């Protein structure tokens, strides 16, 4: 490349880079990929951004393809000649992705998948305490949802503004088996009208008595829930987590309440223990105060005792299937 060509190309290269970074920032804000080589979504994010850069650079440079439309061969030819470093990055990341898939495959790592779940021998008589009949849960999640919706419908000041989340978490609250669910904003306009104070309550359903209750946070001397999945912009739960924990991969967050009735989002942190992408397991959790946004990360062994669920049932079943299959 001659000096004159370099002087003409460099500013346009920088402009292309700035445009790509702007597009990437917006896309990151929306898609929220974990910046982690164990996360397959991170590879997609990087690949597409690199391809966007090549396309933007090609358009700004004013490449003459000889026809109105840009064909695939034009794109590939331009990338090969003008974007060698970008192409090299794509090739390297593609190689990492493919190798990562291979070294994570059960066909090559069957023993590792078998050992993922530590299975020991226990004594049922000494380890399982008897439960009285009035402590046995009698209600599944679907039934709890019906009771919760019905209870919210009785409250004229809330039913027109809020819905009940479909996610009812089973917990032990003050010695009772309870399902708890957050409220959600009915739509964007109802969010706009209520977001300053936050969600004013949550739903609890006693799994033994089948009694549903709307717990108003103001009655407990607590602030409304300002951080939740139904929030928009920076107080959206997943976005808040991503901006504070850029590299963490999270399992599905769920609502729990401590013994004082304060709602917390329990956000289990996932890792991959086999190769790059295999052997999902939980190594800790972020606890986020739904009212104040206060948050902290805990390793599994340090998680407060009032937290009832860190491992999901689906993950345990998956690991048990690996144990039996391999």
Regions found by a protein language model. Give the residues of each.
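Soluble extracytoplasmic regions of secretory-pathway and membrane proteins
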Residues: 2-326
């Amino acid at each position: 490349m001659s000096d004159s060509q370099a002087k003409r190309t460099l500013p346009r290269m920088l402009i292309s880079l700035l445009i790509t970074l702007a597009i990437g920032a917006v896309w990151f804000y929306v898609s929220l990929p974990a910046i982690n080589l164990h996360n397959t979504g991170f590879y997609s994010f990087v690949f597409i951004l690199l391809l966007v850069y090549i396309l933007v650079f090609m358009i700004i440079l004013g490449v003459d393809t000889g026809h109105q439309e840009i064909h695939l061969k034009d794109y590939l030819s331009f990338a090969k000649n003008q974007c060698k470093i970008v192409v090299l990055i794509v090739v390297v990341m593609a190689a990492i992705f493919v190798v990562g898939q291979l070294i994570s495959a059960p066909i090559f790592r069957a023993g590792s998948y078998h050992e993922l779940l530590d299975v020991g021998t226990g004594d049922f008589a000494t380890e399982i305490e008897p439960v009285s009949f009035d402590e046995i849960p009698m209600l599944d999640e679907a039934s709890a949802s019906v009771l919760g919706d019905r209870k919210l419908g009785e409250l004229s000041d809330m039913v027109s503004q809020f819905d009940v989340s479909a996610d009812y978490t089973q917990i032990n609250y003050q010695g009772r088996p309870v399902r708890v669910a957050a409220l959600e904003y009915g739509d964007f306009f109802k969010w706009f009208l209520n977001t300053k104070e936050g969600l004013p309550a949550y739903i609890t359903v006693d799994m033994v008595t089948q009694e549903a209750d709307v717990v108003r946070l103001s009655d407990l001397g607590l602030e409304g829930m300002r951080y939740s999945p139904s929030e928009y912009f920076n107080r959206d739960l997943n976005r808040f987590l991503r901006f504070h924990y850029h590299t963490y991969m999270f399992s599905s967050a769920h609502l729990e309440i401590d013994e004082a009735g304060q709602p917390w989002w329990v956000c289990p942190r996932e890792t991959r223990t086999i190769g790059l992408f295999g052997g999902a397991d939980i190594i800790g959790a972020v606890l986020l105060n739904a009212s104040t946004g206060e948050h902290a990360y805990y390793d599994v062994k340090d998680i407060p005792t009032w937290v009832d669920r860190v491992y999901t049932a689906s993950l345990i079943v998956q690991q048990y299937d690996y144990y039996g299959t391999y």
